[in-house]
UniProtKB/Swiss-Prot annotation:
It holds the Pfam family TRPM2. The gene is Trpm2. The lineage of its organism: Eukaryota, Metazoa, Chordata, Craniata, Vertebrata. This is Transient receptor potential cation channel subfamily M member 2. Residues 815-825, 887-894, 949-968, 984-1020 are extracellular. Activated by intracellular ADP-ribose, beta-NAD (NAD(+)) and similar compounds, and by oxidative stress caused by reactive oxygen or nitrogen species. Ca(2+) and PI(4,5)P2 are required for channel opening by ADP-ribose. Activation by ADP-ribose and beta-NAD is strongly increased by moderate heat (35 to 40 degrees Celsius). Likewise, reactive oxygen species lower the threshold for activation by moderate heat (37 degrees Celsius). Activated by moderate heat (35 to 40 degrees Celsius).
Length: 1507
């Protein structure tokens, strides 16, 4: 067998990643290397060149911290270089050595030793690397010593190279020579590898050279870079190569750093060296001072990967250790050694089947039982996949391969075979993530911790598909509270599919949402979020208000409520009231740092702190929905809205918030997305309301006006109006409700003519001429019917119309007929009438049923255009009245009042918006008015330009301003409508109609004329030309443009006119719904009554229940439950409609076809497997028949029937030579491997001793194994009196008596008499691959005692806990600080002693005798051989396991035991030997040594307990 160092050199032309051996030096965690803000790292990505300052820092830091290796002693080697030159033992030529090495005075005459003659010096190769002629891509590189600390390398990569801490480490290993892969498999591998790296933020580590698997990885990254955008980020590919094997490495040497270093990829001239791959982003070039020696980087790569995997990465709000996975393509012996080391150290491996050689050999046998993986089978596979080099394999190598492959396959939980198109694996990324989850599941953790770790991985990588299939299974039942931290992480990182998954698996939002949770969510808003900046503004304003406060105000929920009120409108109340001092939230953050760094807070600790914290929220679903909406998270908001109860109001509120945010959003794309999402939520509100209205009109209309406590005591209708959701308001059900309100208690079937007749002759009300909606009104007294009629808004409206028309007629009469110096009675009546209008407008201004305050009501009042018009008309009337009452200004007063009459007439437009015919037309007119204003700007340009030019050409020095205005503006404007000026040319030129000097104020100044004054002096051709051009553009072009604008506006508005009219109709209905029934001026009586109620009686204002109704709790709960039920119907209908879409049907059909193909493939595989099983069964039957025939023949021969010569030779052969493969298979099926496993691990624990490989079939001593030559190892013990002598011969051991009790030492085996060969006892379980006694104390059996101390696990009430009906046990275990596993408190015993030494260390001495009594009274659960990694061919461990169970928690002996457990010992702690004891739950995942687990399982079985 080859030594370990030799096998490492065999990987010269292979890429392998080294996995650290189990005894490698432990490395501590890096302090403060994890940066909290990844955005700082992203600004320093690999494609960005260093600034001069950074280059200087790097040029000073690297030489101080990173070294290279140089040979300092030239010793001529017997070998020549490839060029035939003399080289040193290090491989470099004479010229490549430093001057000190050529003249070494210190080492003269000594043999070359790399440990002595290779020294470290500051590195001279680092910086940026650019590959000449290939691309402008800039990478990073560094040359460093093989002894460089992993901490330093990690610091270089993360702090100086600017790499983000990875979420995953992918180590790709395999063939270093170029090999062929099927195109489809190559494409799948490249796509999957880059996909998993890009989606998880992984680092890919390879050998970095431009050959083999490294080249495949580089090309995969190249293809991704060419096809992706800059936003998708970069794939970090790190090549770790040997400096001495790199071709053209001289180009990389720059003592002050290469910025950049130009490297040429020269494959033709590389010879036995290799070139760096141009598609890698970073290179770590490991230097040991030699040239041409491959594999130098493996130890450093091993340590670096191990170190990185021990770091903690926090992503998506969860903290996990950086997982590592090994991906294998092709490969040879070195790759096999790499896989073996990886599996041994617990690193999961993904084998790509179809890539060739080692990968295919392992993939072919991975599904077989270990007992079926024989030497002959491996030999057969090698002959198939290693055809060219199969003849070079020695028998020892084949045996070693068999043993390693058996050990690899034995740990199936770490082995994943990727097969193209099989096992549901569509891509390599799925296989990689499944491998990590499978490995995580196999770790020795208690159930919750293990599954929690798997879920962290899935959330961090955003792989909900794997979480569904691998984590949320029947194997583990999740508690909703366990999912809360992951739920928060999924929300913060915007992973809606995970939120949906958690909700499906029992997370209740009422329990999830607490004060702490909400604060955590709002503190983690993205800085780019508009709501984030609004919060900052609120906090800054509060800080300015509290000028005396030295500390910056901290974020609290009432700050959020302030911003939300701005968005929802002041008609809503604050959603989160300002807390009292004692209610101040525990999580808070200063204003400049609202963005909470998730890496700084443990979500698990957050939920531990908030356990039992009473939620303050009315509706937790609302809180999460608002949080999702303000960030414009579409899918997340949709999922949360589906959980809401008050869903119609929620959808309308979301629409309002989004529309308000879109107005302030500067990013156009984000603004459009917000508007689209607002429309989507409006459609959802319409959909739910439609379902409700179809089911029950009355209850649906109750939903519209129900006061929603959750949304600031507003109503659905009010939210829709605030959000201007015209589609919702124009819904038939809402319009029916508004019509119902409009008609009051009257039936809507009453014709308008009936209403008018009753208004003119109200006694008709007593005849049944008018029908009422409620039958009871039909039978009520006349006064009640009159009150119901005149309180109807429709009646109030028409009474006000009649009153208003009367007012306008009277006003016109006074202005035109009866406007006397002293006001007449008619004019006084107008004054009274106007006073009543003023009183009504004042009532509307101060009407505040919701308690919003005067300022807010004034703001709302003046936001309406018609109110502004009313106030303007009233103020103008007061101005005109003031002038009219002053005799000197009587006429100006009449003019003002005349203009005011126009404004009062315009008010009619608002009145007629209720009309279905006139209302839409009024809307169109309003929109066209906007077009006119834009048109006037264009028209003014032509009018002013032509008017000024014309006036300047025709008239000289006109000084009268009024005539300048007429000439420039007025005449030019009239010209558009056909009034062409006569003096523009000389045909109609006349001086009679003008004033020559401009002295006549009623005549224009004459144009320029000749000296006679009879002919024009201006150029007629010019003025005519200007006139024609002006008419062409102004009269034809601009007027037609205006017509086109009107036409476009008409068509655009006409499509939505009905919606707009229905939306605006509400305002008029609401106005007259709350208006006093009497029309002006009789309305003064109503105002007097109102004044008495408000001022004298102090009765507050109340809103009519028809528009805002606060329901009783029971009624509201029933109504919301009904709405929730119908919302589910709506969602189901939406889902059904989605499935019925053609594109969705095509996708479903495609998926079904793919599933069918997979099923057919699986069926074919099953049929093939079934055929093999049937053949095997047939073989077994034939063998049994042969044995039976042989028995018959033997019996007949013994009975004297024939000689038996030559009879049934087939049966005899079947009996004598049974099928070996069938026998092995049967044995494997019956008892697994059937042999010890841990005792055959190649690397012996606590020593760098490699065992001789022993495959399963060669374990029994009876099996012939001619090449078996195990090494001899016996460790020296400090106390030689307690161990057998050391020696590899039998002479020192001649005095030992085996198979008997030798003095105080019991050398008898529980398995009977064992064989002693050449003075050494032989392990009764077979070969182990190592002779001697190893680290054990005695040759032969080493007897141990394992006391299993158990008690029942009890809850707080004292009851026994159960799991899956079975009771749960707790066991007493111990642990050394250096150990990763716990152990039973037993072990080896000193000769003649009963208690193990380990047990004595944890028990106080006065309790030893009592515990011995407990042991004698205990139950023996196991006695026999222990499969321990310390076992050898000549020494092994046998144990007796005794169960000591305490049935009662109040057992006196149990209490005494707990009292006598050893306490903290400072001396032992200083030596690192202090043991810790703990009661742990008995479970199959308990982190216990494997052989102790088997014992514990027997104890659990003894008591019928859970395991």
């Amino acid at each position: 067998m080859e030594p370990l160092d030799q096998r490492r050199t065999d990987s010269d032309q292979e890429e392998g990643f080294g996995v650290q051996s189990r005894r490698a030096t432990d490395l501590g965690m890096v302090p403060n290397l994890r940066r909290s803000n990844s955005s700082l790292c992203k600004s320093r990505r690999l494609l960005c060149s260093f600034s001069s300052e950074k280059q200087e820092n790097l040029s000073s830091w690297i030489p101080e911290n990173i070294k290279k290796k140089e040979c300092v002693y030239f010793v001529e080697s017997s070998k020549l270089s490839d060029a035939g030159k003399v080289v040193c033992e290090c491989g470099y030529t004479h010229e490549q050595h430093i001057e000190v090495a050529i003249k070494p005075h210190t080492f003269q005459g000594k043999e070359w030793d790399p440990k002595k003659h290779v020294h470290e010096m500051p590195t001279d190769a680092f910086g940026d690397i650019v590959f000449t002629g290939l691309s402008q891509k800039v990478g990073k590189y560094v040359r460093l010593s093989q002894d460089t600390s992993s901490i330093v390398i990690y610091q270089l990569m993360t702090q100086h190279w600017g790499l983000d801490v990875p979420s995953l480490l992918i180590s790709v290993t395999g063939g270093a020579k170029n090999f062929n892969m099927k195109l489809r498999l190559k494409s799948i591998f490249r796509r999957g590898l880059v996909k998993v790296a890009q989606t998880t933020g992984a680092w890919i580590i390879t050998g970095g050279s431009h050959t083999g698997v490294m080249k495949q990885v580089g090309e995969a990254v190249r293809d991704f870079s060419l096809s992706s955008s800059c936003k998708e980020g970069d794939v970090i590919t790190i090549g770790i190569a040997t400096w001495g094997t790199i071709h053209n490495r001289e180009a990389l040497i720059h003592p002050m750093g290469g910025f950049p270093a130009e490297y040429m990829l020269d494959e033709e001239g590389q010879g036995n060296l290799t070139c760096l791959d141009s598609n890698h982003s970073h290179f770590i070039l490991v230097d040991d001072g030699t040239h041409g020696q491959y594999g130098v980087e493996i130890p450093l790569r091993t340590k670096l990967e191990k170190f990185i995997s021990e770091q903690t990465k926090e992503r998506g709000g969860v903290a996990i250790k950086i997982p590592i996975v090994c991906v294998v393509l092709e490969g040879g012996p070195g790759t096999l050694h790499t896989i073996y080391n990886a599996i041994t150290n617990g690193t999961p491996c993904v084998i790509v089947e179809g890539s060739g050689r080692v990968a295919d050999v392992i993939a072919q046998v991975a599904a077989l039982p270990v007992s079926e993986i024989t030497i002959s089978l491996i030999q057969q596979k090698l002959s198939v996949f290693f055809q060219e080099m199969f003849e070079t394999f020695t028998e020892n190598q084949i045996v070693e391969w068999t043993k390693k492959i058996q050990d690899i396959v034995r740990r199936r939980q770490l082995l994943t075979v990727f097969r193209e198109g099989k096992d549901g694996q569509q891509d390599v990324d799925v296989a990689i993530l499944q491998a990590l989850l499978k490995a995580s599941r196999s770790q020795d953790h208690f159930g919750h911790e293990n599954w929690d770790h798997q879920l962290k991985l899935a959330v961090a990588w955003n792989r909900v598909d794997i979480a569904r299939s691998e984590i949320f299974t029947d194997e583990w039942q999740w508690k909703p509270s366990d999912l809360h931290p992951m739920m928060t992480a999924a929300l913060i990182s915007n992973k809606p599919e995970f939120v949906r998954l958690f909700l499906e698996n029992g997370v209740r939002l009422k329990e999830f949402v607490t004060w702490d949770t909400l604060l955590c969510l709002y503190e983690n808003l993205e800085p780019s979020c508009l709501f984030h900046s609004k919060l900052q503004k609120v906090l800054a304003e509060e800080h300015e208000r509290l000028a005396y406060a030295s500390e910056t105000p901290r974020l609290q929920m009432h700050h959020v409520a302030q911003v939300l009120r701005e968005l929802l409108g002041d008609s809503t109340q604050l959603l989160y009231p300002r807390p009292r001092y004692t209610d101040r939230p525990r999580l808070s953050l200063p204003m400049p740092h609202i963005k909470l760094n998730v890496q700084g807070v443990s979500l698990r600790s957050l939920y531990k702190r908030s356990t039992g914290h009473v939620t303050f929220t009315i509706d937790p679903v609302r809180d999460l929905l608002i949080w999702a909406i303000i960030q414009n998270h579409r899918e997340l908001a949709g999922i949360i809205w589906a959980q809401s109860q008050d869903c119609t109001a929620a959808a309308l509120a979301c629409s309002k918030i989004l529309k308000e945010l879109s107005k302030e959003e500067e990013d156009t794309d984000s603004s459009e997305e917000m508007l689209a999402l607002a429309d989507e939520f409006e459609h959802r509100a319409i959909g739910v309301f439609t379902e409700c209205y179809r089911k029950d009109e009355e209850r649906a209309q109750k939903l519209l006006v129900r006061v929603s406590e959750a949304w600031g005591k507003t109503t659905c209708l009010q939210l829709a109006l605030e959000a201007k959701d015209m589609k919702f308001v124009s819904h038939g059900g809402i319009q029916a409700f508004l019509t119902k309100v409009w008609w009051g208690q009257l039936c809507v079937d009453n014709g308008l003519w009936r209403i008018i007749l009753c208004m003119l002759a109200f006694p008709l009300l007593f005849t049944g001429f008018i029908s009422f909606r409620e039958k009871r009104l039909q039978a009520l007294c006349r006064l009640a019917r009159v009150r119901a009629f005149f309180n109807a808004p429709v009646v109030i409206f028409y009474l006000n119309i009649l009153s208003y028309f009367a007012f306008l007629c009277l006003f016109a009469y006074v202005l035109m007929v009866d406007f006397q110096p002293s006001p007449s009675w008619c004019e006084y009546l107008i004054y009274l009438w106007l006073f009543s209008l003023v009183c009504e407008e004042t009532r509307q201004l101060f009407y505040d049923p919701d308690g919003c305050g005067l300022m807010k009501m004034a703001s709302l009042y003046f936001s309406d255009f018609w109110n502004k018009l009313d106030v303007g008309a009233i103020l103008l009337f007061i101005a005109g009245l003031t002038c009219r009452l002053i005799p000197a200004t009587l006429y100006p007063g009449r003019i003002i009042l005349s203009l005011d009459f126009i404004m009062f007439c315009l008010r009619l437009m608002h009145i007629f918006t209720i009309s279905k015919t006139l209302g839409p037309k009024i809307i169109i007119v309003k929109r066209m008015m906007k077009d006119v204003f834009f048109f006037l700007f264009l028209l003014a340009v032509w009018v002013v330009s032509f008017g000024v030019a014309k006036q300047a050409i025709l008239i000289h020095n006109e000084s009268r301003v009024d005539w300048i205005f007429r000439g420039v503006i007025y005449h030019s404007y009239l010209t558009i409508f056909g009034q062409i000026p006569t003096y523009i040319d000389g045909v109609n030129f006349s001086m009679d109609q003008c004033s020559p000097n401009g002295t006549d104020p009623y005549k224009p100044k004459c144009p320029e004329s000749d000296w006679t004054g009879q002919a024009p002096a201006f150029p007629e051709w010019l003025t005519v030309t200007l006139l024609c051009l002006y008419l062409l553009f102004a009269n034809i072009l601009l007027l037609n443009l205006l017509i086109a604008m009107f036409n476009y506006t008409f068509q655009e508005v006409q499509e939505h006119t009905d919606q707009i009219w229905k939306f605006q109709r509400h305002d008029l209905i609401e106005e007259y719904h709350g208006r006093p029934p009497a029309p002006p001026p009789l309305i003064l009586l109503s105002h007097l009554q109102l004044l008495i109620k408000r001022i004298v009686l102090k009765i507050p204002a109340k809103r009519h229940k028809q528009l805002k109704n606060k329901l009783e709790k029971n009624e509201e709960a029933a109504l919301l439950s009904w709405e929730l039920y119908l919302k589910e119907n709506y969602l189901q209908n939406q889902q059904y409609q989605h499935k019925q879409r053609p594109e969705q049907k095509i996708q479903d059909i495609s998926e079904k076809v793919d599933t069918m193909v997979d099923l057919l493939d699986m069926d074919r595989v099953k049929r093939s497997g079934s055929t093999e099983q049937r053949l095997a069964s047939l073989e077994e039957q034939v063998t049994q028949m042969g044995r039976s025939l042989h028995w018959i023949v033997t019996t007949l021969k013994d009975s004297g029937f024939g000689s038996g010569a030559g009879a049934l030779t087939l049966a005899q052969r079947a009996f004598d030579e049974p099928d070996a493969e069938l026998s092995i298979r049967k044995k494997g099926e019956e008892g697994g491997d059937g042999y010890h496993v841990s005792a055959r691990h190649l690397l012996y624990p606590d020593a760098r001793i490699m065992r001789f490989p022993v495959p399963n079939e060669k374990v029994p001593w009876e099996a012939e194994f001619l090449i078996y030559d195990p090494p001899f190892y016996t460790a020296e013990k400090k106390d030689a009196t307690l161990t057998d002598p050391v020696g590899d011969t039998a002479e020192p051991l001649s005095k030992i008596n085996y198979n008997v009790v030798d003095g105080l030492m019991d050398r008898c085996s529980f398995h009977g008499t064992y064989v002693v060969q050449y003075g050494f006892p032989l392990n009764p379980m077979g070969r182990t691959g190592l002779r001697g006694r190893g680290s054990l104390s005695w040759f032969g059996p080493n007897h141990t005692l394992q006391p299993v101390v158990t008690r029942w696990k009890r809850n707080q009430g004292g009851g026994i806990c159960r799991k899956s009906v079975r009771k749960m046990l707790e066991v007493l275990v111990v642990k050394l600080p250096q150990s990763e596993h716990w152990a039973l408190p037993g072990g080896s015993r000193e000769p003649g002693k009963m208690l193990p030494r380990k047990l004595k260390q944890v028990l106080q001495q006065e309790y030893w005798v009592t515990f011995e009594t407990l042991l004698r009274q205990g139950t023996e659960v196991y006695k026999g051989y222990v499969d321990d990694p310390r076992n050898t061919d000549n020494a092994w461990i046998e144990t007796v396991a005794v169960s000591i169970h305490f049935q009662d928690q109040n057992d006196v002996e149990l209490k005494r035991l707990e009292e006598n457990l050893q306490t903290h010992d400072p001396k032992e702690s200083a030596r690192g030997l202090e043991m810790s004891t703990e009661w742990q739950v008995v479970d199959r995942r308990i982190p216990l040594y494997v052989n102790h687990k088997k014992i514990l399982q027997k104890v659990a079985s003894l008591f019928g307990a859970h395991f």
